[in-house]
Amino acid sequence: MDSLKNRTLLKVIVLGDSGVGKTSLMNQYVYKKFNKQYKATIGADFVTKELHIDEKSVTLQIWDTAGQERFQSLGAAFYRGADCCVLVYDVNNLKSFETLNNWHTEFLKQANPMEPETFPFVLIGNKTDVDGGNSRVVSNKRAIEWCGSKGNIPYHETSAKEDTNIDEAFLSVAHIALSNERKQSNDIYPRGQYHDSVTDIIDPDQSRGCAC
């Protein structure tokens, strides 16, 4: 087993409106479980996934944040130190797509990355299974165009309920986060090991997550 000090910690923040399926995506990816009963996330929580990428041992720490506006003031404490941000919307909910700009802007404001113009984002359009796709209101083309307006960020469509494209989406996130972590490795305060002030207390063999 890899020693703790040789593992790279990648911090990923998942953002989007309440009810788009952020927690369900994470729980499906980490635990292969889906809970039909919706329960809003309060504040923030996280799950972890152990990976090997390019012969490197990685702990992907995925932060699940509340979609309600009253919790957005908590952002700075959770966003800072992130290696990648995943924006999630519901392909059947136009409002959840239209608020992506707000989430994108708010993250950059709160996280305050060193190079905001090149900070990595990934977009996920979730709930593709609903009504066999007949309830969809945001087209694949429109989503890709939005990604193009943000510097051609990667886009994935998923169904947390059916476990469709979940592993592929998060593997893409992990590769992007690792690439960003390596890019930042020459900073004054090297990141990526288990000495980050926010995550010192984390046991990589234990993970927490919401039920929904």
From Swiss-Prot:
Motif Effector region, chain ranges: 38-46
Signal peptide region: none
Membrane topology of the entry: Lipid-anchor
Modified residues (Cysteine methyl ester): C212
Gene Ontology terms: biological process: protein transport
Function, as annotated: Intracellular vesicle trafficking and protein transport.
Family: Belongs to the small GTPase superfamily. Rab family.
Protein name: Ras-related protein RABG2
Organism whose genome encodes this protein: Arabidopsis thaliana (Mouse-ear cress)
